[in-house]
Amino acid sequence: MTDHAAAITALRAQLSALDRTRPVGGRPPVATGVPAIDGALPAGGLVCGGIHEVLPGRHCGAGHGFVAALLGRLPESDGRILWCRAPGPANAALYAPGIAGFGLLPGRLLQVYPRSDEDALWVMEEALRCRRLAAAVGDGLLPTPTQCRRLQLAAEAGDTLGLMLLPPTARPPPSVAMTRWRVAAAPDDPASDGLGRPRWTVNLLRCRGGGAGNWDLEWDDEALRLDLAGPVAHRPVAAAE
């Protein structure tokens, strides 16, 4: 057996060992903790058993921070989190202190580095079906609408939160995910001394059964939560597709 095949077999065995049935009733949505945002989502948060896409700005740092902040809200009792990074020299190991700064304990992460996009999508599908994982993150992957539908079905089967951190691109494919967000870094608070809190401009571009909106957020690194950073432009639009 080749090293590659052995790695795939080992991962399958690890996911199988984790897989146990959760209590009947499913998991509640994952609230962002920001009432203005959660009020714009039909379920009051990100629905588990579904795919949610995050489209970063020119650089992925803001997207990574936003995703880590969301994952940090998952109870530890929900299980571990698989983080699958797309092949490529830029996708090195996640910076543990940076992740911990957003309330996500590095020890909860199972980091996977497939050799091809095909393998990465397979990993995501298997992980989303594993009912003992709290969430699965596809970092740098750009699935086609058909591939995204497969991931959605896998997430529904596992009742698992699926987050796709798309690569920076001017023309992402049409979304079939439950939500699609655009996250970009925002300027620091001019009143802050030195290095201010992380700030992001977050746009909800698509929400199945809901609307859209724009928010300026900042990360409170003492309370470990997201807060509104200033005046909010939140304009509901027609019901989403």
State where each predicted segment sits.
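Solvent-exposed alpha-helices and their adjacent loops that cap or buttress functional pockets
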Residues: 46-47, 128-130, 156, 194-196
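Conserved beta-strand scaffold positions in the cores of enzyme catalytic domains, especially
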Residues: 51-53, 111, 180
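Phosphate-binding/switch region of NTP-binding enzymes
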Residues: 167-223, 227-231, 238
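Generic beta-sheet signal
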Residues: 52, 84, 133-138, 162-167
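Conserved nucleotide-cofactor-binding alpha/beta core module
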Residues: 78-134, 141, 145-149, 154-158
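A polyampholytic, Gly/Pro-enriched intrinsically disordered region
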Residues: 128-137, 184-190
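Detector for small/aliphatic-rich hydrophobic stretches
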Residues: 1-83, 92, 98-106, 206-210, ...
